[in-house]
Amino acid sequence: ILDQYTQQGGNSMYLIDPVHVQKDSLYALSGTTVSYGNALELDDLFFKFGFRLRQELVKDLYSAPIVLAQGQQNTSQYLPYPWPYNPLAAPNQDHPIGSAVGSVHFQFASPIDTLKNKVKKTVLIQSSSLSKIEGIPSLINLSSATEPIKPSLFTDSKQTLGVLLEGRFNSLYTNRIHPFEWKSKEIQPARMAIFSDGNLLENQIDKGQPLELGYDKWTNNFYSNKQFLKNTIHYLIEDNRFLSLRAKEIKIALLDTAKTESELLYWRYFGLFAPLLILLILGLIFNGYRLKSYRQ
């Protein structure tokens, strides 16, 4: 269904976890979990489309913190700690989707590889240059957040976490025998966005109610997940008016600093005495008019 939908020009957005991390176990009393591959049986289809989701985890020094309780019972304190498994990724500012959008909060994301074919590919979002790839399966321990981070280990450069694909996608079933005759064999152009984190559009819950997308209630921080995904959807449905309006830049004319400093004394005295001079002239005109009226 996905293959034929794309062949007929259907636009789509995928948010997929190539690696499964059981967060319920991680945040339980044990504070540990094991990451392992998430078998979705979509690898061949995505490979044909022109990309591959790698079953690895991206760790980033530039990341969102997590809040952990420190101390015992009544004396415990909730403190933020850096958590490299939560990359704060930077959108592509040169594309309408990422223009003027801040950092986007990912959780246990994976790298994406692009493959050579006729489909146009644009990287939408990446981790920072201080990234590290972690293989699976791996043991993830919550207590590691309190340990010192070694920046020297984060040497894997930027990792792609989101890609936009545009063009005519070849079918996975090309040159295979069809069970029935397809009406149109002409492939229609389509757009596709892929992100390697299914939690990208996950809202946090507070008192049974969903919070705004991108808001972290534990740190009181706002991230740009909502705006980034809205831009992606508007681009996929070809709502260019919304994107062009958001991407519009208003240039503010700035004063010439050197000229301002050189003429500072002049304008200071001008601002001080010019109003007084204007009042004096107006007073003389008014008095002259009154004297002329009395003489008549």
Kindly label every feature range from the protein language model:
Residues 1-241:
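Acidic, S/T/G-rich, low-cysteine, solvent-exposed domains in lumenal/extracellular/periplasmic regions
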Residues 230, 234-260:
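Juxtamembrane amphipathic/hinge helix adjacent to a transmembrane helix
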Residues 254-296:
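C-terminal signal-anchor/stop-transfer transmembrane helix together with its immediate cytosolic
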